[in-house]
């Protein structure tokens, strides 16, 4: 099963046990805790430990058909909030306090030190009461879609929830956070002409990306009080199954949460001049995070936003400013296609926020890992750059503007039949806590040590199994 590519090996570390007896669709890793939630065809969500890969709890009773997608709400302290999307046309929101009981601590391998801490604090709570507190609470059911809900995503700030459906619509809901689990519908977007398969929020801004059966990717933003489409990305020749954002990049070389910038690999062992690296970071910072998409057409494409040009000098107009339209449209270009490695539809792509690696999988049961590297080849001009008027290019030369060093993507690992004869529906990167370090700290109140955590890849298959992989290089 391991890969045979020269760049690295994808090693099967473990399965999450016990597996589901029905098809599993997607797994979502918690933003703070070493746990992951898996969506199942049996109408349930299974929550597993990423410390010892065992089942912690099963969330059920809220949906009447398969749970197709789920997402953890970010920036929530003291509790975990999970949104679930179902084929029954509804979206559920579940809540649970992060105070895990002793039974779960045993499963996580955390019982020793924590049990002693409880005794020192005088914790003599009855076990039955503790078990009751551990239950997930079904907070609210969001109803509005006319057909199967395919994907759900929280905004980076956690106040907005996006859902999409087979009914060709995208709904944006606002969590009022009033203590009564009230949500308000703020937008219903219906520009797609086919099933909407996926929604994903920008990692820093309130900008939403969607992929559809109509072969397009669309970007949405709020303008004043109305949400609307700001870009339509065309290029795929089949259903767009998944879109994912790159981690933010800053000139300082830090992505905002203490993790290093996901720079491309330098194949010449550091010979790339620091000024060239800085130029690459500056250009990426101006463009913002890129998008990766995968499709029925068996391609994976990287998309980049073109920075907006400086506004022209102010010209007085007889038209009042209150009725002059403000342009919020964005221009996106297809930057490249990743090496062709899949024989059938590609269902899922995942862009690591820690390493910058991209993982893909699909109907052929293959998992592929790609990395970006700097290349000595001159930058390839995109069609839109070639179409620039001569005056614009002359202006660039006059201003001494330089093009950032070019990059290319290469395959570093590939595994065939990752789930034997079954299709693989989803892959995602996850943070795995070190079990020995976790035993030394109070799991209830601590976040994972981001500097020392290990990143693993989770694959979710039609066989009901979620597999854990590590990349060895």
From Swiss-Prot:
Signal peptide: none annotated. Pfam families: WD40. The keyword Repeat applies. Residues 384-400 have a biased composition (Basic and acidic residues). WD repeats lie at residues 11-58, 62-104, 144-183, 191-230, 235-313, 341-380, 438-473. Transmembrane segments: none annotated. Residues 1-25, 112-133, 377-405 are annotated as: Disordered. It comes from the Eukaryota. Keywords: Repeat, WD repeat. Residues 123-133 have a biased composition (Acidic residues). SMART domains: WD40. One of its GO terms (cellular component) is cytosolic [4Fe-4S] assembly targeting complex. One of its GO terms (biological process) is iron-sulfur cluster assembly. Coiled coil: none annotated. Belongs to the WD repeat CIA1 family. Essential component of the cytosolic iron-sulfur (Fe/S) protein assembly machinery. Required for the maturation of extramitochondrial Fe/S proteins. This is Probable cytosolic iron-sulfur protein assembly protein 1. It comes from Coccidioides immitis (strain RS). The gene is CIA1.
């Amino acid at each position: 099963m391991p890969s045979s590519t020269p760049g690295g090996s994808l090693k099967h570390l473990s399965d999450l046990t016990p597996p589901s007896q029905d098809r599993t669709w997607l797994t979502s890793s918690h933003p703070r805790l070493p746990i992951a939630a898996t969506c199942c065809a049996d109408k349930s969500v299974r929550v597993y430990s990423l410390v010892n890969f065992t089942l912690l709890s099963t969330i059920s009773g809220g949906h009447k058909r398969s749970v197709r997608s789920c997402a953890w709400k970010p920036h929530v302290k003291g509790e975990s909030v999970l949104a679930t999307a179902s084929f029954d046309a509804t979206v559920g929101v579940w809540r649970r306090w992060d105070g895990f009981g002793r039974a779960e601590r045993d499963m996580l391998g955390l019982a020793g030190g924590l049990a002693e801490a409880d005794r020192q604090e005088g914790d003599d709570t009855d076990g039955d009461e503790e078990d009751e507190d551990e239950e997930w609470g079904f907070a609210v059911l969001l109803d509005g879609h006319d057909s199967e809900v395919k994907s759900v995503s929280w905004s980076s700030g956690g106040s907005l929830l996006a859902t999409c459906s087979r009914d060709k619509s995208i709904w944006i809901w606002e969590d009022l956070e009033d203590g009564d689990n009230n949500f308000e519908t703020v937008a219903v977007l219906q520009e797609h002409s086919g099933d909407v398969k996926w929604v994903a929020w920008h990692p820093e801004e309130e900008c939403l990306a969607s992929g559809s059966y109509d072969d397009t990717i669309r970007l949405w933003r709020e303008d004043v009080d109305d949400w609307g489409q700001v870009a339509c990305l065309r290029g795929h020749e089949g259903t767009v199954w998944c879109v994912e954002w790159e981690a933010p990049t800053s000139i300082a070389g830090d992505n905002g949460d203490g993790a290093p910038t996901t720079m491309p690999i330098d194949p010449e062992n550091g010979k790339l001049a620091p000024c060239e690296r800085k130029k690459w970071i500056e250009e990426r910072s101006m463009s913002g995070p890129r998008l990766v998409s995968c499709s029925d057409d068996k391609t994976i494409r990287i998309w980049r936003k073109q920075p907006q040009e400086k506004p022209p000098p102010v010209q007085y107009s007889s038209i009042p400013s209150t009725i002059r339209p403000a342009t919020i449209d964005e221009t996106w270009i297809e930057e490249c296609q990743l090496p062709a490695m899949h024989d059938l539809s590609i269902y899922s792509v995942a862009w690591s926020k820690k390493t910058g690696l991209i993982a893909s999988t699909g109907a052929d049961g293959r998992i592929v890992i790609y990395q970006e590297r700097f290349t000595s080849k001159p930058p390839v001009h995109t069609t839109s750059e070639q179409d620039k008027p001569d005056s614009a290019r002359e202006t660039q030369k006059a201003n001494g503007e330089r093009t950032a060093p070019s990059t290319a993507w290469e395959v570093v690992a590939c595994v065939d039949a990752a789930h034997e004869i079954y299709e693989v529906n989803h892959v995602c990167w996850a943070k795995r806590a070190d079990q020995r370090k976790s035993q030394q700290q109070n799991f209830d109140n601590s976040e994972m040590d981001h500097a020392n955590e290990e990143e693993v890849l989770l694959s979710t298959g039609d066989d009901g199994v979620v597999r854990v992989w590590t990349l060895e290089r």
